[in-house]
Swiss-Prot record, chain A:
It comes from Homo sapiens. It is a multi-pass membrane protein. Its EC number is 7.1.1.9. It is an enzyme of class 7 (translocase). It is found in: Mitochondrion inner membrane. This is Cytochrome c oxidase subunit 2. Component of the cytochrome c oxidase, the last enzyme in the mitochondrial electron transport chain which drives oxidative phosphorylation. The respiratory chain contains 3 multisubunit complexes succinate dehydrogenase (complex II, CII), ubiquinol-cytochrome c oxidoreductase (cytochrome b-c1 complex, complex III, CIII) and cytochrome c oxidase (complex IV, CIV), that cooperate to transfer electrons derived from NADH and succinate to molecular oxygen, creating an electrochemical gradient over the inner membrane that drives transmembrane transport and the ATP synthase.
Swiss-Prot record, chain B:
A motif (Cx10C motif) lies at residues 56-67. Testis specific. Weak expression in thymus and heart. Expressed in cancer cell lines. It comes from Homo sapiens (Human). Component of the cytochrome c oxidase (complex IV, CIV), a multisubunit enzyme composed of 14 subunits. The complex is composed of a catalytic core of 3 subunits MT-CO1, MT-CO2 and MT-CO3, encoded in the mitochondrial DNA, and 11 supernumerary subunits COX4I1 (or COX4I2), COX5A, COX5B, COX6A1 (or COX6A2), COX6B1 (or COX6B2), COX6C, COX7A2 (or COX7A1), COX7B, COX7C, COX8A and NDUFA4, which are encoded in the nuclear genome. This is Cytochrome c oxidase subunit 6B2. A motif (Cx9C motif) lies at residues 32-42. The keyword Disulfide bond applies.
């Protein structure tokens, strides 16, 4: 999860997020390169009193700096499209969980697992114990196995919400009357936090998401039923 | 009218609905609805022919996994009251 004053991306817990982090670094390097090139050129032109007559109305230069940006955009677009289509893959899921947004909590349905349904409310500050996280911890966590493709069906009962877990690279809108599907595979166990990411009213900031990802053997023992 | 209080299917080798190439998009509402319709059509057809409705169990499992429970309850209520919009 994010630590205080963090400005970078969270550590990846899914292959999709690993790809997204790599792409972020790739795009950022290109941005730095272009920014320094442009700033350097601006600096040179602003600090000189001379005029270069070869630069005025130079067709070759115009051609170069029209084609070169197009090539750079392609270099950014190709990996971006690849990741976009990767996130849409369903990958033969092993488990389907439904997440239903309400004002202002999430309901989860494990209908593949005995029909377990529960609500997930943020712990109010008065109920926090030492070690709990303010505005992030909930009364009932979503417990899921790692290394298994999981399908999330996300919808809403009242207004728009968005089910987002940054460390898994997930952000899917919860729209009333629409059933959005997303899949992920977690690669390491732990407790991961997310938050509603679509303004949904006064308590939009107070409907967190907590996923507890555990090894499959332990998940099969059934701790999910002891929530 | 068919009994819409479907029984819970027996425990078995069921995992979760597989990928359905008819519904490849992110929006799975048609997948949910289609399997709900297919289940009730299957029940209706096999009941009329006096055959076992066990093969209909697959459709039940799929829509039970994909559809939010509140949606299913609402549709079942509409079927009971004879005002369900879908064609079964």
């Amino acid at each position: 999860m994010a630590h205080a004053a963090q400005v970078g991306l969270q550590d990846a817990t899914s292959p999709i997020m690993e790809e997204l982090i790599t792409f972020h670094d790739h795009a950022l390097m290109i941005i730095f390169l272009i920014c320094f090139l442009v700033l350097y050129a601006l600096f040179l032109t602003l600090t000189t009193k001379l005029t270069n007559t070869n630069i005025s109305d130079a067709q070759e230069m115009e051609t170069v700096w029209t084609i070169l940006p197009a090539i750079i955009l392609v270099l950014i677009a190709l990996p971006s499209l690849r990741i976009l289509y990767m996130t849409d893959e369903v990958n033969d899921p092993s488990l389907t969980i439904k997440s239903i947004g309400h004002q202002w909590y999430w309901t989860y349905e494990y209908t593949d697992y005995g029909g377990l349904i529960f609500n997930s409310y943020m712990l109010p500050p008065l109920f926090l114990e030492p070690g709990d996280l303010r505005l992030l911890d909930v009364d009932n966590r979503v417990v899921l196995p790692i290394e298994a493709p999981i399908r999330m069906m996300i919808t809403s009962q009242d207004v728009l919400h968005s089910w987002a877990v940054p460390t898994l690279g997930l952000k899917t809108d919860a729209i009333p009357g629409r059933l959005n599907q997303t899949t992920f595979t977690a690669t390491r166990p732990g407790v991961y936090y997310g938050q509603c990411s679509e303004i949904c009213g006064a308590n939009h900031s107070f409907m967190p998401i907590v996923l507890e990802l555990i090894p499959l053997k332990i998940f099969e023992m059934g701790p999910v039923f002891t929530l | 009218m068919l009994d819409v209080e479907a029984q819970e299917p027996p425990k078995g080798k069921w995992s979760t609905p597989p990928f359905d190439p008819r519904f490849p998009s992110q929006n799975q509402i048609r997948n949910c609805y289609q399997n709900f319709l297919d289940y009730h059509r299957c029940l209706k057809t096999r009941t009329r022919r006096g055959k076992s409705t066990q093969p209909c169990e697959y459709y039940f499992r799929v829509y039970h996994s994909l559809c939010p429970i509140s949606w299913v309850e609402s549709w079942n209520e509409q079927i009971k009251n004879g005002i369900f919009a879908g064609k079964i």
